[in-house]
Amino acid sequence: MSAQENSAPFLRIPPWLRTRIPCNRTYTATRELIGDLNLHTVCQSAKCPNMFECFSSRTATFLILGGTCTRNCAFCNIEPGDVLPPDAGEPQRVALAAARLELKHVVITSVTRDDLPDGGAAHFAATIQAVRSRLPRCTVEVLIPDFQGDAAALQTVLQARPDVLNHNVETPPAHYSRIRPQADYSQSLELLRRARAAGFTVKSGLMTGLGETDAEVLGVIDDLCATGCNIVTVGQYMRPSRRHPAVQRYVHPDMFEEYAAYGRARGIPHMFCAPLVRSSYNASMFVQEKN
């Protein structure tokens, strides 16, 4: 991240991004349960703006494979650093938390574990299986890393039969060297293409406000359409701290509606585009529509 990006002019947060914090007993109980079971959530680790709403409605996205990452994407609040071996008891604790929260749709994601031979794919599969064993009627969505393009690792996850396979491209390809220097845009598209070709419901997403143009956003939507992607999310990047890239622009809600209309016209059935949309925000909506 350049000094110029970090010192970009301050942009006042627009009114459509100001939300009421519905902190209540359910929020507190959800947070305490997650802590008691020694689990991580991406909601907390990434400082998601929807955390209070989601915890208050007994929903969470479970973050497996530890709380530190082997990569250092510029937008992300999850810390890079030394990582620990996978916790063999974690899949069962995720399943227990899902049962206690009475979840009907579970979202599982992870830090990126380039240190592991399979990138953590077997741990994903074990967690899916643990949730299914405890909650047979529960649908499961996984938000996976790119596994460094390892087709066998992807197949390990697919063999566990998640209901939704999510992998985010995050930003247009022209910005990867600055925003996702350890990732590869074409590799991410190939992962999505493979999952869709295998018959799975496939989802991806990106953020606005990191220096991209509207034309570039539409170009990403075109690329995702070409993979066969069923679901696309587009939301506004919010700077987690002063050490992260400054927000380059706040996209108006009307423009998000245009993104959604464009995607639907291109043939993507489910477009979720709004300033506060996040990859797993209201993730169960698609499953409800599908059923």
UniProtKB/Swiss-Prot annotation:
Gene Ontology terms: cellular component: cytoplasm
Pathway(s) it belongs to: Protein modification; protein lipoylation via endogenous pathway; protein N(6)-(lipoyl)lysine from octanoyl-[acyl-carrier-protein]: step 2/2
Main location: cytoplasm
Residues binding [4Fe-4S] cluster 2, per UniProt: 69, 73, 76
Keywords noted in UniProt: 4Fe-4S, Cytoplasm, Iron, Iron-sulfur, Metal-binding, S-adenosyl-L-methionine, Transferase
Domain Radical SAM core: start-end pairs: 55-269
InterPro entries: Aldolase_TIM (IPR013785), Elp3/MiaA/NifB-like_rSAM (IPR006638), LIAS_N (IPR031691), Lipoyl_synth (IPR003698), rSAM (IPR007197)
One MF annotation (Gene Ontology) recorded for this entry: 4 iron, 4 sulfur cluster binding
Entry superkingdom: Bacteria
Catalytic class of the enzyme: transferase
Signal peptide: none
The UniProt record lists the keyword Iron-sulfur: yes
Catalytic activities: [[Fe-S] cluster scaffold protein carrying a second [4Fe-4S](2+) cluster] + N(6)-octanoyl-L-lysyl-[protein] + 2 oxidized [2Fe-2S]-[ferredoxin] + 2 S-adenosyl-L-methionine + 4 H(+) = [[Fe-S] cluster scaffold protein] + N(6)-[(R)-dihydrolipoyl]-L-lysyl-[protein] + 4 Fe(3+) + 2 hydrogen sulfide + 2 5'-deoxyadenosine + 2 L-methionine + 2 reduced [2Fe-2S]-[ferredoxin]
Family: Belongs to the radical SAM superfamily. Lipoyl synthase family.
Protein's recorded name: Lipoyl synthase
